[in-house]
């Protein structure tokens, strides 16, 4: 594979390209790396490669001319990557994809980045190493080059080395041990000394699963899992922020069809479905709020039937879900009940299909790490203004990019729970 790196600081790569396996791969001709400095393609005596941005603002911007001329000088550029924070996240899957290419070209940005016209002239793919900022693209380019090169056949020597490491199957790698067998009382696990390859493979897989759940649960949804893996993961203890999440279905005050505030009647489907969703996602509780006595009696009758009466015997799963439901007069009563149960006053997060909101699923997950969160859902045409005004935050609406986002409250509740907690939290 041939890789051409365009950089203002070619000396940055001197040591890394000569060290270890990369140095051996270059010596053998397996990997060919060319360093091109765009300053060589400037025409002024100062070798200027940047200039002030149009429209004002801080910093300098890379000029088009020297970079375009440098690209023109590459006989076979192959895919052209630009290391930039705005780019597509670099992953192991992308590394495998790029390892199939015969040629790659990597542009290392500096300052405020490139004149955008360079991307109009060439089919450049912006690639990011993560949500952080570096002084330039050289460090990122080196990471890409190494990740891709080690997947080229022959680079690693033993091919399994590249396929058994972290992320190869969407999981973190298992721990490694070497001699001595006992170091200051820290002993190598017996299974690794047993010589039983089947037990060793099973132990390593379980370690990978355990580490991934503990350290990177966010990558589990895309991991390669079989049914045995899923059974093993279910049996592990884990952080359960969902237990810190509560929801309330508000029937007063809500917006009515006439746009005034008032009360709505309880709906059997809403209670059942949100109750089942709350149980599925492991919420701490589900409150149904209504100050109307006849509606409270109706709720009590329904809950008794499913949790204590004939319904509990015919459908134990439904009994478990509806057993988490509690009727209260209003949102304030739900807040007070959560405070009594947990010793902490919850954050109150409202929901609405209108407006921009000021909270996202990620920010609500962060709240869950601090103290309980009460999600508030409105019936009718949504929560009344006075309820929303009393919330600590309001979630951004679902499907806000499209013109139609008229979901039933039970559908919205299920979607929001899934976005907050997914399969692993």
Curated annotation (Swiss-Prot):
Q: Which BP terms from GO are recorded?
A: tRNA N1-guanine methylation
Sequence positions that bind S-adenosyl-L-methionine: 109, 129-134
Keyword set, alphabetical order: Cytoplasm, Methyltransferase, S-adenosyl-L-methionine, Transferase, tRNA processing
Coiled coil ranges (UniProt) are: none
Start and end residues of each stretch annotated as Unknown: 242-425
Q: Per the record's keyword annotation, is Transferase included, yes or no?
A: yes
Enumerate the GO terms in the molecular function aspect. Answer: tRNA (guanine(37)-N1)-methyltransferase activity
Region ranges (tRNA (guanine-N(1)-)-methyltransferase)? 1-241
Provide one Gene Ontology cellular component: cytosol
Question: What reaction does this enzyme carry out catalytically?
Answer: guanosine(37) in tRNA + S-adenosyl-L-methionine = N(1)-methylguanosine(37) in tRNA + S-adenosyl-L-homocysteine + H(+)
> In terms of one coarse class, where is the protein primarily found?
cytoplasm
CDD domains cross-referenced by the UniProt entry: TM1570-like (cd18085), TrmD-like (cd18080)
Gene3D superfamilies the record matches: 3.40.1280.10, tRNA(m1g37)methyltransferase, domain 2
List S-S links within the chain.
none
Similarity section: Belongs to the RNA methyltransferase TrmD family.
What does this gene product do?
Specifically methylates guanosine-37 in various tRNAs.
**What HAMAP family is this protein classified in?**
TrmD (MF_00605)
**Subunit structure comment from the entry:** Homodimer.
The record's section on NCBIfam families has:
PRK00026.1, trmD
Name of protein: tRNA (guanine-N(1)-)-methyltransferase
């Amino acid at each position: 594979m041939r890789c051409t790196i365009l950089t203002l600081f070619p000396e940055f790569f001197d040591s890394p390209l000569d060290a270890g396996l990369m140095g051996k791969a270059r010596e053998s001709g397996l990997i060919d790396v060319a360093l091109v400095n765009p300053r060589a393609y400037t025409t002024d005596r100062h070798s200027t490669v940047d200039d002030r941005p149009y429209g004002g603002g801080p910093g300098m911007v890379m000029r088009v001319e020297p970079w375009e001329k440098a690209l023109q000088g590459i006989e076979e550029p192959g895919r052209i990557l630009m290391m930039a924070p705005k780019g597509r996240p670099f992953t192991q899957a992308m590394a495998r994809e790029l390892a199939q290419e015969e040629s790659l070209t990597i542009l290392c940005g500096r300052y405020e980045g490139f004149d955008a016209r360079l991307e109009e002239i060439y089919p450049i793919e912006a690639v990011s190493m993560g949500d952080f900022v570096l002084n330039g693209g050289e460090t990122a380019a080196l990471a890409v080059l190494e990740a891709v090169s080690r997947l080229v056949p022959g680079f690693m020597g033993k091919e399994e080395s590249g396929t058994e490491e972290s992320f190869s199957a969407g999981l973190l790698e298992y721990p490694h041990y070497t001699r001595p067998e006992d170091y200051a009382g820290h002993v190598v696990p017996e299974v690794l000394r047993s010589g039983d390859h089947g037990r060793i493979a099973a132990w390593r897989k379980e370690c990978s699963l355990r580490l991934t759940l503990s350290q990177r649960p966010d990558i589990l949804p895309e991991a390669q899992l079989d049914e045995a893996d899923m059974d093993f993961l279910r049996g592990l203890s884990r952080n359960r922020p969902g237990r810190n999440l509560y929801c309330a279905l508000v029937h007063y005050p809500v917006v009515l069809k006439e746009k005034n505030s008032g009360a709505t009647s309880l709906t059997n489907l809403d209670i059942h479905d949100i109750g089942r969703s709350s149980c599925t996602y492991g919420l701490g509780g589900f409150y149904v709020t209504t100050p109307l006595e006849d509606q409270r009696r109706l709720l009590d009758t329904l809950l008794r039937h499913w949790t204590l009466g004939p319904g509990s015997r015919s459908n134990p799963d439904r009994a478990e879900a509806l057993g988490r439901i509690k009727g209260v007069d209003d949102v304030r009563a739900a807040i007070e009940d959560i405070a009594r149960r947990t010793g902490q006053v919850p954050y109150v997060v409202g929901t609405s299909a209108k407006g921009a909101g000021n909270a996202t699923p990620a920010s609500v997950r962060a709240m869950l790490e601090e103290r309980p969160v009460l999600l508030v859902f409105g019936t009718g045409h949504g929560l009344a203004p006075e309820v929303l005004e009393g919330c600590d935050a309001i979630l951004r609406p679902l499907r806000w990019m499209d013109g139609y986002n008229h979901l039933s409250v039970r559908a919205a509740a299920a979607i929001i729970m899934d976005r907050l907690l997914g399969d692993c939290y």
